[in-house]
Amino acid sequence: MKDFTLSTYRQLLLALKNGGCNFLTFEEWCDGKATVPFVILRHDVDLKAGHSLATARIEAEMGVKATYYFRIVPQSNQPEIIESIVRLGHEIGYHYEDLSLFNGDSPKAIDHFDKQLTHFRQFYSVRTICMHGSPISKFDNRDLWKTYNYHDYGIIGEPYFDFLNAENIKINQILYFTDTARMWDGDKYNVRDKINQQLTVNSEQVSSQQLTNSATHQDVHSTFDFINWINSNPSVNCMMITTHPQRWTDNRIEWLQEFIMQFVKNKLKQLLVRIR
């Protein structure tokens, strides 16, 4: 069986279910509805929105709920697909990149953010958002909230501020996995999908990303490694898993295209990480 196929994704979900994990959306977690052990499935729909409908259908068949974050670009923002995913019982949110789109102009960015939020609220009462990494841009989209407050726009949660933050990780021992770079240990290719806050552990300053890596990413490279890790660690209480659905397909041609494109992107991202 090849990695990053829908069949493999189904096996990953099955391992989580067999491990006794409760599946909830990020919105539900923000509302205080989590019961441990739990996993939040987060999907960043960067491209190929149709692939997200495929994963959403598999999840619905298995009685699993997930959260899908859509960009405003045409490759992601496809109303019929968004509506179908909502009908399947999943949460959707805005995968915002406004600060990058407006080259750091915060007033223009927040105006654009507000308009796009209104757009997505046609399909779902969007209450959570998540930044798009925009790896080529020099602007971090999260910096918009240095000037503004997303709570003023009816938003109750943003994963990097409210879930994947140092204090929450320290208290709740949260683990974080992402398929960035088309692997589960792709930190060296990761520009922004990481945890940067600092923790004090045994009087030493370490990054919370280092903590999650030491706890989870040892020997976890492929999805099959991930499944084995889940089967070997039944005591995990809190976990967020981020996937990019465009990477997951049973179509051989699309699978090969994604494999080649990701190889090229990884080389470029590795250069960006070194420069920054």
Positions of predicted regions on the chain:
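Terminal accessory/targeting
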Residues: M1-R42, D46-T67, S76-N77, V86-L88, ...
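Catalytic beta/alpha-barrel core
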Residues: R71-V73
